[in-house]
Regions:
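Mid-domain alpha/beta scaffold segments of enzyme catalytic cores
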Residues: 1-259
Length: 259
């Protein structure tokens, strides 16, 4: 199988080495390794160079962090352009739903416009480079992101760990956008309902590691092999056998990322 979304650069080095070396025996053939910013992209690039074919890097700027100074953003965009041939996608990019929600909860002012402009620039780069995008866009933010994707004529969009209302789900399905499920599909009703609704041909499996999970994964280090659990849970919702579910999710990921 393929873990369609993981932050390898956030694992401690010794753990990372053992994790990556264990993948063949865990029946994991590849990982889509996303990045947070330029420093993160450089680390992801280094990991991918040590594990060619196994680690497929994506470079970008994660929205749930302070906005970069213009010179830093320009450096990132130039660097991504320079290394476009080496990357599977631009990501992780999107809008800061959780940061905004926290600020509002604490009565703090929040201006979304700079984040929307940043995403617009990153999507423009993806369009120019003809690369797919890995998106952090949930709930009402996903509708805005759909608007931007259409403005840039981007069709290869992967909404990772997606959550959102029915009208947005319908819009995403109509545009052929992909989503991916994490191990929380085993214990979150909201996610299970979405999994039943979203077309099987537009779905992938991910871990978002090293993000920790609850339920049967409480206290465990997040490992790419958990995508097997995701496949089993997702397949059960659709009446697939375990092997059928794994084959479908893997084929979808290969097709989307052109692996």
């Amino acid at each position: 199988m393929i873990d369609a979304h993981i932050h390898l650069d956030q694992y401690e080095e010794t753990l990372l080495s053992s994790l990556l070396q264990s993948l063949p025996e865990q029946d994991i053939e590849s990982l889509i390794a996303v990045s947070m910013n330029l420093a993160s992209s450089l680390r992801t690039q280094g990991i991918a160079a040590r594990y060619p074919g196994l680690v497929r890097p994506a470079y970008g700027f994660h929205p749930e962090q302070p906005l970069p100074p213009e010179e830093d953003l320009a450096a990132l965009l130039d660097w991504i352009t320079l290394h476009a041939r080496d990357m599977a996608a631009i990501g992780e990019i999107g809008l800061p739903y959780y940061s905004r929600a926290e600020a509002i909860e604490h009565g703090e002012a929040w201006d979304m416009e700079p984040y929307t402009r940043l995403l617009d620039r990153l999507l423009g780069l993806a369009a120019r480079l003809a690369k797919p995008v890995v998106l952090h866009a949930v709930y009402e933010d996903a509708w805005t992101v759909c608007d931007l994707l259409e403005q840039h004529h981007i069709t290869r969009a992967h909404f990772h760990w997606f959550k959102g209302p029915g009208d947005t789900v319908d819009r995403m399905i109509s545009r052929g956008y992909y989503i991916s499920f994490t191990p929380d599909i085993l214990y979150e009703q909201e996610i299970q309902d979405l999994a039943r609704r979203y077309p099987p041909e537009l779905v992938m499996a991910e871990t978002d590691g090293p993000w920790p999970f609850e339920g049967p994964f409480t206290g465990r280090t997040t490992h790419p092999a958990m995508v097997h659990d995701v496949a089993a849970a997702w397949g059960a919702l659709h009446g697939y056998t375990g092997s059928e579910a794994k084959a479908i999710l893997t084929a979808n990921t290969v097709r989307f990322y052109g692996l």
